Structures are given as structure tokens and as C-alpha cells.
Amino acid sequence: MEMTNAQRLILSNQYYLMSQMDPENSAKYQRLQTIVERGYELQMRELNKEFGCLTEAECREIIDIMEMYHAMQESNKMLADQERAEVDQRRLQFLGFDIASEAQIVHYVRFLVDSEGLYPQFDKADHHFNSQMPMLEKYRRMLTTWRNCPRQYHLCATELSQIFSA
């Protein structure tokens, strides 16, 4: 992250103020203040983590993935009891993404659910959409299979199984 000396001074002052206003996290803010004041570029990369960016296409892809799960859950509700018994109900739960490798996406999902009020039926579970394993590639394969289904919001048990297995 490139900053002028004036920008570094302003940010340093912000961290100082935060350390005074939030005593519980004072050590964290003092550390960040030191990094900015002294210009430790390796550690300044940490500051960039907070300012990630998801493109419009990436946002739409995440919404499509969540919509696919919504469609699968609604389709499952419409199945006859006998057909529903063929579907692994646990696989209908949207797990989210891996906070370690897909953090920006996890934060976006949380934003959509918590701030935007979308998909209130999704169970946050204990991990609040942190699947604890990378999921994006799996979801992409599932999305491709789902898009090939003729009736995406009225899936049969076989189609659900095919999507899960993608």
C-alpha cells in the first residue's frame, strides 16, 4: 500500500484515537500505528486485507450460488415424501465459504444475509457461513449442473443428487 507521509500521519492519528476509544483492542491499534508511522511495508500489507474488493461479476456469482441453494431447498419442499427420502437433507444446507482462503466471499455472504436481509432461511450455524474448507470451485461445478436443469426451481430428487455430486 503506497501512502504519502501526510496520509500516514492521518492514519497514525486514527489508530492513536482508536487505541484511546477502544481500550480492549488498544494493543492492536498501537501496533498498527507503529507500522504506519515507521513505514514497515511488509506489515503494511496487512492493512490491505481490510480493503478487499469483489467485482460485480464475483458478487453476481455468489448471489447465483445462494439462489441455487434457495431453489434446491424450495424444490425439496415440493417433493413427495417418498422422493424426499432419497435426498440427503444435510446437503441442502448452504455451508458458506472458507474464511481462511475465501474471506472476502464469506464477508459478502454475511453482508447479504445480515445487512440486506436476503436468504433468511439459510442456517448460519455455529460458524456463520464459514465452511472451514474451500468451496468456490465445488459451488461452480454445482452451479453449472443446476443451470443445465430444465426447471431450476422445481428439481426432482435425481437432479438434486446430480447437483450435489457435481
From Swiss-Prot:
Disulfide bonds: none annotated. It comes from the Bacteria. InterPro entries: UPF0304_YfbU (IPR005587), YfbU_alpha-helical_sf (IPR023146), YfbU_helix-hairpin_sf (IPR023145). Belongs to the UPF0304 family. This is UPF0304 protein VS_1049. It comes from Vibrio atlanticus (strain LGP32). The lineage of its organism: Bacteria, Pseudomonadati, Pseudomonadota, Gammaproteobacteria, Vibrionales.
